[in-house]
Amino acid sequence: MPCGGYFSVDSLRGVLVLVVDSHPRGRETLREILSYCGALVTPTASVDEAAGVMRQVKPDVLIVALPEGDDVAFIRDVRSLKPEEGGVVPAIAIARDADDDLARSRGYQASLRTPLDPWELCRLVSSLMTVR
């Protein structure tokens, strides 16, 4: 993956990102992009797997690429957690028809459309970290 001229490839160093994507290729692509920018990525394939990870580790950012309905129920469950359990973790929804207003109304901080721009993803994760 080439270096993006305006974005340092280690700018996400130490950021813990939990990825929830039911598609193996999507999960791997997200892992590669975020790892390239320095993030520590835990990819999961399901809501149940992600919930199990969140009971053990509190991610800095949550990225959700699930079919509509599954993602809504999952983020609702996350938002019902206490802050110390991860209930306030910044979250990004990824979908073909992503809409920021709709995503925010569901409990996400932002959304990204597919196909993804790798640098846009890394910049968005970085911006969510500076807001915290």
Predicted regions and their residues:
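Non-catalytic signal-transmission and effector/linker regions of two-component phosphorelay proteins
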Residues: 1-24, 31, 37, 48, ...
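Alpha4 helix (beta4-alpha4-beta5 surface) of REC/receiver domains from two-component response regulators
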Residues: 73, 93-114, 123
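Conserved phosphotransfer microenvironments
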Residues: 63-82
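Short beta-strand element of Class I
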Residues: 41
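Conserved phosphotransfer cores of two-component systems
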Residues: 55-57, 77-88, 106
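Short acidic, S/G/P-rich loop/turn micro-motifs used as interaction or catalytic elements
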Residues: 23-26, 65-71, 98-100, 118
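Acidic, metal-coordinating helix/loop segments flanking the phosphotransfer/catalytic sites
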Residues: 45-61, 68-69
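Short beta-strand/turn micro-motifs composed of small residues
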Residues: 19-21, 64, 93-95
